[in-house]
């Protein structure tokens, strides 16, 4: 583990450096997955088809880190203090993502969503809702594609992340390891049933207030976050060489696997998703927690990727909307739009780093002092 980390709190435990790096790799796969939405007609032909599974990896990793950092503090820590810490860690980037989305909204018009017809008052209301993480219903969201957060789509997972942290503060941390195991097994079975026999043949859900998204998104959280907590309790490190590179390669390959089974055999893709969230991702978290960076290059790469992972996840999607509109308006192929795609990825990384250093870290330090988090 690295003894240096970007944190608002001096007493935060050292990070697992490799897990930080793997989180950054997963965030980059999400950006690339979203890029190819501009060319997909459905889940069946989406390139980097399983990039959505990165969210399940994030949830497991979040549960693991929260359990590692806080499970032994509850004798001296109040629920309010924990929730303040999580708010300070998570919410500044929720706000900046919403504001970037609002500023760029009227530049994102295309045949799929005619943003020119949206009143400024509606945009202001949507911005406030996104800032406060209040989800929009399909009939009232301003882009017209059914997202909970039409200015910055990925905010949906932060909505569930907050729910996971609230459940942890009031309930999950009190559970014995045995009871927690039963919860994880039950939720995992529910999510597997949704993946195998649900309407989609995948678990790419949670981003809208529809029945299947609410059920699927809730199951994704209720398995993955407690699974991470459980891992933090039972994990025993083993000696592993090259853990970061093995884990990174695995995440990229798993995300890039094409859709399995087509429209006639949806269960086959559901089985793939189940193997990933139930088996592979917990193993990858254990792999990353077991390994140590042994050279300066890997250490720096992991630190950088870990630093930008959350900002990157929260600032890239307004530019995906813009890219999507450009591709649709100009009827571009991927090859024709490749320079723009490269610029989007590189620009998002730069913006994420700038937001981290110029906004997120200073704001977290300020809020920590103001709210007297020690």
PLM feature segments, named:
Residues 2-19, 25-51, 67-80, 136-146, ...:
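Alpha-helical transmembrane segments in multi-pass integral membrane proteins
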Residues 19, 81-82, 90, 157, ...:
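Alpha-helical transmembrane segments and their helix-entry boundary regions
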Residues 87:
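Active-site helix-to-loop segments that bind/position phosphate- or nucleotide-bearing substrates
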Residues 90-162, 178, 190-211, 275-289:
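Membrane-interface helix-loop-helix regions
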Residues 165:
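Short, conserved beta-strand/beta-arch hydrophobic-aromatic motifs that form part
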Residues 187-192, 321:
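Residue-level recognition of pore/gate-forming positions within transmembrane alpha-helices
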């Amino acid at each position: 583990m690295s003894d240096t980390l970007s944190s608002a709190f001096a007493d935060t435990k050292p990070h697992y450096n490799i897990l930080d790096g793997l989180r950054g790799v997963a965030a980059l796969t999400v950006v690339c997955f979203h890029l190819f939405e501009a060319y997909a007609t459905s889940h069946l032909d989406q390139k980097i088809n399983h990039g959505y599974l990165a969210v399940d990896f994030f949830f497991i990793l979040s549960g693991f880190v929260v359990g590692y950092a806080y499970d032994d503090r509850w004798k001296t820590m109040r629920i309010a203090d924990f929730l303040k810490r999580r708010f300070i860690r998570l919410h500044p980037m929720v706000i900046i993502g919403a504001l970037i989305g609002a500023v760029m909204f009227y530049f994102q018009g295309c045949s799929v969503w005619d943003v020119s017809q949206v009143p400024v008052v509606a945009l202001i209301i949507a911005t406030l809702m996104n800032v406060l993480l209040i989800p929009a219903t399909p009939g009232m969201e301003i882009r017209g594609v059914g997202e909970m957060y039409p200015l910055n789509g990925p905010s949906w997972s932060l909505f569930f992340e907050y729910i996971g942290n609230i459940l942890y503060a009031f309930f999950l941390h009190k559970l014995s390891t045995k009871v927690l195991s039963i919860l994880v097994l039950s939720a995992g079975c529910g999510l597997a049933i949704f993946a195998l026999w649900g309407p989609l043949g995948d678990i790419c859900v949670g981003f809208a207030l529809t029945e299947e998204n609410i059920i699927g998104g809730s199951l994704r959280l209720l398995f993955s976050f407690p699974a991470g907590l459980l891992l933090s309790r039972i994990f025993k490190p083993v000696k592993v060489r090259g853990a970061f590179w093995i884990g990174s390669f695995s995440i990229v390959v798993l995300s890039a696997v094409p859709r399995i089974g087509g429209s006639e055999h949806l269960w086959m893709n559901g089985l793939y998703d189940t193997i990933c969230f139930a088996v592979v991702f917990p193993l990858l978290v254990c792999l990353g927690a077991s390994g140590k960076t042994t050279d300066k290059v890997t250490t720096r790469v992991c630190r950088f990727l870990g630093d930008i992972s959350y900002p990157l996840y929260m600032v890239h999607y307004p530019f995906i909307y813009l890219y999507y509109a450009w591709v649709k308006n100009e009827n571009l192929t991927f090859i024709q739009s490749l320079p723009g795609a490269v610029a989007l990825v590189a620009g998002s990384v730069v913006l994420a780093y700038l937001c981290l250093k110029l906004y997120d870290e200073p704001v977290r330090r300020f809020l920590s002092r103001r709210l007297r988090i020690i």
